[in-house]
Design a protein with these regions (language model features):
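Short, charged alpha-helical interaction segments and adjacent helix-coil junctions
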Residues: 32, 39-44, 134-216
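Upstream accessory/linker segments immediately N-terminal to the RecA-like ATPase cores of bacterial MutS
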Residues: 106, 114-127, 133-145, 152-153
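A near-ubiquitous, low-amplitude feature marking generic local secondary-structure context
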Residues: 12, 24, 38, 66, ...
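Pocket-edge structural micro-motifs
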Residues: 84-87, 122-123, 169
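A short, ordered amphipathic alpha-helix with a cationic face
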Residues: 125-129, 209-212
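Accessory alpha/beta interaction modules
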Residues: 1-117, 127-129, 191
């Protein structure tokens, strides 16, 4: 565990699309630190079987967006961290934290130093003695964002986070904006699904017409 001095230009719900026809990603939290390292943090509530490959896709999209045309060396590619926070143990070993870096199968101690790290944080880990107490408290707080959970911790950082959360919740204006943003995203997804279904029906209809014309 180390301190991460972040720059000011960080954001939430940052959308990234590398190519016009490629699938975009919407990052929950995107941050850059003073050492120019990239952090993308995602909260995943539902257990899905594609989270590992989803983390791979997010990392590849970020990497592609970082290296501009004409840059002479791949060594200028920034280190990046994909952090997935889940209220379940995706891997089943009881750990609060699983850190993945590319390693050599033939030489387990040989790590490919490519600067790409993926971390999965499990709020329901069972090995508190192997990680910091602050991380355990933070993960518990993220799952149960309550006054009671915030009062349990000695971490001033977590208490500051809770104070900020309380201010956001108590602000009617921010609350309304949050709900509006949530509703907009919900309807955008629904419209996208409906457009997809409509296009699918159109294609089916075209196929039927083509087949009938071919018979005639």
């Amino acid at each position: 565990q180390r301190e991460i001095p972040l720059l000011e230009e960080n954001g939430t719900e940052k959308e990234l699309r590398v190519f016009p026809l490629s699938r975009s990603i919407r990052m929950d939290v995107f941050a850059v630190d003073k050492e120019d390292k990239i952090y993308n943090t995602e909260m995943q509530q539902k257990k899905r079987n594609d989270l590992a490959k989803r983390s791979r896709y997010y990392q590849s999209m970020i990497d592609t967006s970082l290296l501009e045309p004409g840059i002479p060396s791949y060594n200028l590619l920034k280190d990046s961290y994909i952090i997935m926070i889940t209220p379940f143990d995706l891997f089943g070993y009881g750990r609060y934290q699983y850190t993945f870096e590319t390693g050599c199968r033939e030489e387990p101690g040989c790590i490919l130093e490519d600067g790409a790290v993926r971390i999965f944080l499990n709020t329901r880990g069972t090995n508190p003695e192997e990680v910091s107490q602050e991380l355990v408290d933070l993960l518990h707080y993220l799952e149960h964002t309550t006054d009671e959970e915030a009062e349990k911790t000695d971490s001033q950082r977590i208490r500051r986070i809770h104070s900020h959360v309380c201010k956001v919740k108590s602000s009617e204006e921010i609350g309304v904006k949050y709900m509006q943003a949530w509703e907009e995203k919900y309807y955008e997804r629904e419209e996208g699904r409906e457009e997809g279904r409509t296009e699918g029906r159109k294609e089916q209809l075209k196929d039927i017409i083509k087949k009938k014309l071919a018979r005639n």
